[in-house]
């Protein structure tokens, strides 16, 4: 799906900027650095998760009818 055309037009070791400048990505392009130069503090430790024990199982209570609204069957 277009791969035949894209292989000849795209190189993985070059970039083209908005101004049209071609930047080659090779070992000479990059500077050597060390992560120790950045002086980044270590991340704070993650808090320990708190697990709550489930309570005892309770049987749901039936809804109580209001006795004053009950009709007398007789």
Swiss-Prot record:
It is a lipid-anchor. It comes from the Viruses. GO terms for biological process: anatomical structure morphogenesis; viral budding from Golgi membrane. One of its GO terms (cellular component) is host cell plasma membrane. Residues 36-74 are annotated as: Disordered. Transmembrane segments: none annotated. It is found in: Virion tegument; Virion membrane; Host cell membrane; Host Golgi apparatus membrane. A lipid is attached at residue 2 (N-myristoyl glycine). Its main location: virion. Myristoylation and palmitoylation (probably on one or more of the nearby cysteines at the N-terminus) enable membrane-binding and Golgi apparatus-specific targeting and are essential for efficient packaging. Phosphorylated. Phosphorylation does not seem to be required for recycling to the host Golgi apparatus. Packaging is selective for underphosphorylated forms. Residues 34-40 are annotated as: Asp/Glu-rich (acidic). A motif (Di-leucine-like internalization motif) lies at residues 15-16. Keywords: Host cell membrane, Host Golgi apparatus, Host membrane, Lipoprotein, Membrane, Myristate, Palmitate, Phosphoprotein, Virion, Virion tegument. Belongs to the herpesviridae cytoplasmic envelopment protein 3 family. Plays an important role in the cytoplasmic envelopment of tegument proteins and capsids during the assembly and egress processes. Also participates in viral entry at the fusion step probably by regulating the core fusion machinery. Interacts with cytoplasmic envelopment protein 2; this interaction is essential for the proper localization of each protein to the assembly complex and thus for the production of infectious virus. This is Cytoplasmic envelopment protein 3.
